[in-house]
């Protein structure tokens, strides 16, 4: 291939054992080549970009010093692990990253023994690594080291503090590396972010560290007895200052740093020096997200996952969206601002996703009425509940897959009290290339059993706006609105804000042979499949948009149950426990026995690929729906006695 870069060192590194054959003086060149390889690959094969550039030196140093995969490295979130993948046998396959059948977007033990723990969500690395350290000790593997790499805002998550609290009371050989780049996807927020900044810039603490280091350096001139005495004095001085200014030392976790996270030789030296120190330790690195690529260093949020770009000029290759429908996320943002201008009780809450979910629109217009609470989904829900309890009306926007982490908070802190909290579940359904950790396919199944909770899903942008308007009306109680990532279907998306009666669906099309019941935007695919099937086979299909999973539109379902012997339910969620199950339960409870085919996500974790590819694999695309409808045409004349509810 023309202009293909040549790497004098990286080309010879297939696994970390090859890296460890180099001298420490060669590591900076390895880092430069690895960084350029990441830039080259991601310029044409989009993925998480800036985070991986920021940890190139750390990644190289870790695999150079530690005996991976025997030694364990646990990456928090994992979107910074592209360099790790390239160095661990996947460089040739890296062009398939995030593609159907290719390597996975996040570390996965099923893919490589170097990927020690599944990741994708934040703040779990310390707990997982501590568990591995305990396992190593119990098995007598005294020479096995365990490292947790946490950063990108993950220290704001409660689970990280739970892991620290547990680690502080153990003597296990655990190293926690704090990758401090002041960023999640957006800029980090909260007290921990400010604390780390103060810790990095504290003159008093840094001066004390310098003086203690200088004393210890000179101890080679002293006899053994006096050397030990000065070591004890230095440790005492460090302990005294640390207890006053360092939360980690105060928790009995030895603290080292902060150090330059882009000096690979120094990182390797320090890792080597502290590797065999027993007990929990923290090494604090200060890094720059997007390091080595100017545009990413300047605008890390945009370059978190920028899409395609020119690797030389840094110009992003953005598709022309003129005349296209808007993103559901932007419709949410604009509508929230519109509602908040009229309803002074409305507040906005998001856990570290203001730009991703478009909560930043409200933050920009009314900064005192919107909160980024950091990576803290449980807190976001309970915080919203507290505001609702005293008269405010929070719109709590959390990605569907991340809302799983706040399940008890929804039940205990909102639903039991019937509090007026609007949960906007962004990224509902199959999200595509980010894979099983990010698909929002479980929400309908796990929310449906919760009493007092209204669950809705709009088919299009107009429905989203009207559901948001409905949810903020008085005394609606907990109200969930789920909608997908990406573009809607209406170019003219603005519409009057009107109430939708809670629990009322709608008949989109009449028919006599078969009833199709859908919920959410997948109804658009169903409508096209129905039109094709009717034209090809003559079948007469009625189409109902359920709108609300809870409460169900019982009047609509009685109409369907009385009229139709064949029903197809279609949803963009897990088939176990979802909308199809709700229809089955209703029909059985009310003495209707139609034949029901359910279309949805099967009972398995769906891998990564484009949304269109994944819909096809699950039989949820237009062609899959068409096949189910036309197959039902063959059974239209079956006797009533043979019709039974079927699971599919």
Swiss-Prot record:
Residues binding thiamine diphosphate, per UniProt: 79, 120-122, 153-154, 181, 293, 377
UniProt cross-references to InterPro entries, sorted A to Z: Dxylulose-5-P_synthase, THDP-binding, Transketo_C/PFOR_II, Transketolase-like_Pyr-bd, Transketolase_BS, Transketolase_C
Family matches, as CDD domains: TPP_DXS, TPP_PYR_DXS_TK_like
EC number: 2.2.1.7
Cofactor binding: number and manner: Binds 1 Mg(2+) ion per subunit.
Alphabetical list of SMART domains matching this protein: Transket_pyr
EC main group: transferase
NCBIfam families hit by this protein: dxs, PRK05444.2-2
Protein name: 1-deoxy-D-xylulose-5-phosphate synthase
Organism: Bacteroides fragilis (strain ATCC 25285 / DSM 2151 / CCUG 4856 / JCM 11019 / LMG 10263 / NCTC 9343 / Onslow / VPI 2553 / EN-2)
Gene, per the UniProt record: dxs
């Amino acid at each position: 291939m023309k202009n293909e870069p040549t790497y004098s060192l990286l080309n010879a590194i297939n696994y970390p054992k090859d890296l460890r054959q180099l001298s420490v003086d060669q590591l900076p060149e390895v880092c430069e080549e690895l960084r350029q390889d990441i830039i080259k690959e991601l310029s044409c094969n989009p993925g998480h970009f800036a985070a991986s550039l920021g940890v190139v030196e750390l990644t190289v140093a870790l695999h150079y010093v530690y005996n991976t995969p025997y030694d364990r490295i646990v990456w928090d979130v994992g979107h910074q692990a592209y360099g790790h993948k390239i160095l661990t046998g996947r460089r040739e396959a890296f062009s398939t990253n995030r593609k159907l059948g290719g390597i996975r977007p996040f570390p996965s033990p099923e893919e490589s023994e170097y990927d020690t723990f599944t990741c994708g969500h934040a703040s779990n690395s310390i707990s997982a690594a501590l568990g591995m350290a305990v396992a190593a000790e119990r098995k007598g593997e005294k020479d096995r080291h365990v490292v947790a790499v946490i950063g990108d805002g993950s220290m704001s998550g409660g689970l990280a503090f739970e892991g620290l609290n547990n680690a502080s009371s153990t003597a296990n050989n655990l190293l926690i590396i704090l990758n401090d780049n002041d960023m999640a996807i957006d800029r980090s927020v909260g007290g921990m972010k400010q604390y780390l900044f103060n810790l990095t810039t504290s003159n008093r603490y840094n001066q004390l560290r310098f003086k203690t280091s200088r004393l210890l350096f000179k101890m080679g001139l002293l006899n053994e007895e006096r050397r030990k005495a000065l070591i004890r004095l230095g440790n005492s001085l460090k302990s005294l200052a640390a207890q006053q200014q360092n939360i980690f030392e105060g928790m009995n976790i030895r603290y080292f740093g902060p150090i330059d996270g882009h000096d690979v030789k120094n990182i390797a030296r320090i890792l080597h020096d502290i590797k065999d120190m027993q007990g929990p330790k923290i090494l604090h690195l200060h890094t720059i997200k997007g390091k080595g690529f100017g545009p990413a260093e300047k605008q890390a949020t945009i370059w978190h996952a920028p899409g395609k770009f020119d690797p030389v000029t840094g110009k992003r290759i953005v598709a022309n969206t003129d005349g296209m429908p808007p993103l559901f996320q932007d419709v949410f943002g604009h509508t929230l601002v519109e509602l908040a201008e009229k309803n002074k009780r409305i507040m906005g809450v998001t856990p570290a996703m203001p730009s991703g979910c478009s909560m930043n629109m409200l933050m920009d217009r009314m900064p005192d009425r919107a909160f980024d609470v950091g990576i803290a989904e449980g807190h976001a829900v309970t915080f919203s509940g507290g505001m609702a309890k005293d008269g405010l009306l929070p719109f709590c926007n959390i990605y569907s897959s991340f809302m799983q982490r706040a399940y008890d908070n929804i039940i205990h802190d909102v639903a039991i009290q019937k509090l007026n909290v609007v949960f906007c579940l962004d990224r509902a359904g199959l999200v595509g290339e980010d894979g099983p950790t990010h698909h929002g396919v479980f929400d309908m199944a796990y929310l449906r059993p919760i009493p007092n909770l209204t669950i809705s899903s709009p088919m299009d942008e107009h429905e989203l706006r009207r559901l948001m308007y409905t949810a903020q009306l008085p005394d609606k109680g907990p109200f969930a609105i789920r909608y997908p990532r990406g573009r809607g279907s209406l170019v003219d998306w603005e519409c009057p804000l009107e109430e939708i009666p809670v629990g009322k669906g709608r008949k989109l099309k009449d028919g006599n042979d078969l009833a199709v019941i859908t919920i959410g935007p997948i109804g658009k695919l169903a409508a096209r499949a129905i039109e094709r099937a009717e034209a090809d086979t003559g079948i007469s299909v009625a189409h109902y948009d359920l709108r609300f999973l809870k409460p169900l539109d019982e009047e609509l379902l009685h109409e369907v149950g009385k009229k139709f012997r064949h029903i197809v339910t279609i949803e963009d969620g897990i088939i176990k426990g979802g909308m199809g199950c709700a229809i089955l339960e209703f029909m059985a409870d009310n003495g209707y026995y139609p034949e029901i085919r359910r279309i949805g996500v099967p009972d398995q974790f769906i891998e990564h690929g484009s949304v269109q590819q994944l819909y096809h694999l699950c039989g949820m695309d237009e062609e899959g729906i068409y096949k189910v409808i036309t197959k039902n045409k063959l059974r239209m004349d079956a006797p009533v006695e043979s019709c039974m509810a079927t699971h599919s």
